[in-house]
Regions:
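Domain-level signature for soluble enzymes in the chorismate/prephenate branch of the shikimate pathway
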Residues: 1-97
């Protein structure tokens, strides 16, 4: 592999590493907010899950994915995983309250 190829490959990897770090930071911020939502729901005896909100989120995310040339099914799978974690956390908060 030539030095130019190695350098370009390294640049790609650096970009991916930066994006991965940003994703982790964004997820951390998202979960900080959903923790607050979980406590709010527990204090006001609201259910941990909101199917209407989840459906709206999925529909919106699919639109964003399509507009960004990202497979909407892939984006939906990621969001569903995140939503499941949030609901699990909200249920734990509810049980602790």
């Amino acid at each position: 592999m030539s030095d130019d190829v190695k350098a370009q490959h390294s640049e790609f990897r650096d970009s991916i590493d930066n994006i991965d770090a940003a994703l982790v930071h964004l997820l951390a911020e998202r979960f900080k907010i959903t923790q607050k939502v979980g406590h709010f729901k527990a204090e006001h005896t609201l259910p941990p899950a909101d199917k209407n909100r989840e459906a709206a989120q999925v529909a919106h995310l699919r639109e964003l994915a399509e507009a960004s040339d990202l497979d909407p099914d892939f984006a939906e799978r990621i969001l569903n995983f995140i939503i499941a974690e949030v609901i699990k956390n909200h249920e734990q908060i509810k049980d602790e309250t």
